[in-house]
Amino acid sequence: MCVALSALDAVVHISAPEGERNVAFSDFHRLPGATPESDNNLKKGELITAIDLPEKGFSKYYSYLKLRDRASYSFALVSVATGLDLENGLIKEARIALGGVSHKPWRVKEAEDFLKGKEPKIANFEATAQMILKGAKGFEHNRFKIELAKKAIVRNCMMALDPTSQRPGAKPSL
């Protein structure tokens, strides 16, 4: 759910004895850095009281794809949440978040902005996938995830355009 909430620009409402604050969901989780034991930006004594989803045009063209090892039905090798807002056949706004590739849901705003005003077609989604994963470095045991993520991004963007492709047993067009 974290990947989808990040893609949809959710806002986390936090309460503490000192008062309340709001944090964009994409900023709620942290990269390990010097404190790998802390995976979020909650401070001591704080409590999540609500999570809001802003009204956007993503309700029609949205998809979530989770790729996982057959032996493990819980943790994703790669997951992708995509929201597209179309107007006159062109992409007005795009949101793409990856899971399973970083310590937190991964978004690249420049890649989302690249899609604005473009046709929703495979070539544009492939270029976006390249932008999202530019500079990605894998290790011996997970290097395959980079190419897997690129393919998953393109597939999920195409799935978002066709909600019927998400029915159980449906075969995506890609």
Q: In which residue ranges do the predicted regions lie?
A:
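C-terminal structural segment of proteins
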Residues: 1-174
